[in-house]
Amino acid sequence: MEGSNGFGIDSILSHRAGSPALPKGDPLLGDCRSPLELSPRSESSSDCSSPASPGRDCLETSTSRPGAASGPGLDSHLQPGQLSAPAQSRTVTSSFLIRDILADCKPLAACAPYSSSGQPAAPEPGGRLAAKAGEDFRDKLDKSVSSASSDSEYKVKEEGDREISSSRDSPPVRLKKPRKARTAFTDHQLAQLERSFERQKYLSVQDRMELAASLNLTDTQVKTWYQNRRTKWKRQTAVGLELLAEAGNYSALQRMFPSPYFYPQSLVSNLDPGAALYLYRGPSAPPPALQRPLVPRILIHGLQGASEPPPPLPPLPGVLPRAAQPR
């Protein structure tokens, strides 16, 4: 019933897979062949007693793809520039298996144009092409790096030469503020300044202007000299006080520094603290009388003369006084 109506599986496959490459006088050829065996690559096996499996056909398709275009059944239909062998095999077999689709894909190196004789040109191996392209890119990169390095070296050298030339032409930049030149005083000017400083440690504005005019100096020069001289005087005074205090020689200290350190205590205590500052401005007063002489009395007696008897010494503790014997 299936054979009479023409709806059998074999009849449908035979009508759908019909190809002009198949011989017309063999109607049973499509009944005993699978769709994969109808491709031009498998026409050499015309025996229908042992049909090949689809896996074997796919393996043969992947291995025998380069020479598939030279089949005997397709010589009259294909021209040298029309269709490739895998595309024609896809059209004939109408197989949509993943293995057939992957087998039909050519590598990139195999897609070279055909020669004039109709035979495909021998493709160059992909590894050699990749190596050649890598070598070309490496050469270009080396050239660009070398040119860039040479340019940078030239620029650095040029900048260094420019800096050297500019440093030779221009004076070096000083970070610190340049110091002013010191005033060279003459011996006469120094003597007058020292004499004025002995009289007055601090000058008023009018006195300073008069002294500057008399010595042919500026007011700033006199003011600076007085400031430096007061600093030196205070430092010497502090050092002298320490040394003399350690030695205990207060009389020498009073003779050296009569004012303002050794005013009588009663006078200094009665003055206002603000008014006590004016003691520096006035002339130095004569040294006051010694309140407690530190020199031994026997030396004072020797200086006064031998006519007067020496005053009696105070008795020492723990020693009995002896009576004076007549001479």
UniProtKB/Swiss-Prot annotation:
It comes from Rattus norvegicus (Rat). Residues 33-54 have a biased composition (Low complexity). It is found in: Nucleus. Residues 308-318 have a biased composition (Pro residues). Gene3D superfamilies: Homeodomain-like. The gene is Barhl1. Residues 1-90, 113-181, 303-327 are annotated as: Disordered. It comes from the Eukaryota. Pfam families: Homeodomain. One of its GO terms (molecular function) is DNA-binding transcription activator activity, RNA polymerase II-specific. Its main location: nucleus. GO terms for biological process: midbrain development; negative regulation of neuron apoptotic process; negative regulation of outer hair cell apoptotic process; neuron apoptotic process; neuron migration; outer hair cell apoptotic process; positive regulation of transcription by RNA polymerase II; regulation of transcription by RNA polymerase II. Residues 79-90 have a biased composition (Polar residues). InterPro entries: HD, HD_metazoa, Homeobox_CS, Homeobox_TF, Homeodomain-like_sf. Belongs to the BAR homeobox family. This is BarH-like 1 homeobox protein. Residues 133-143, 152-166 have a biased composition (Basic and acidic residues).
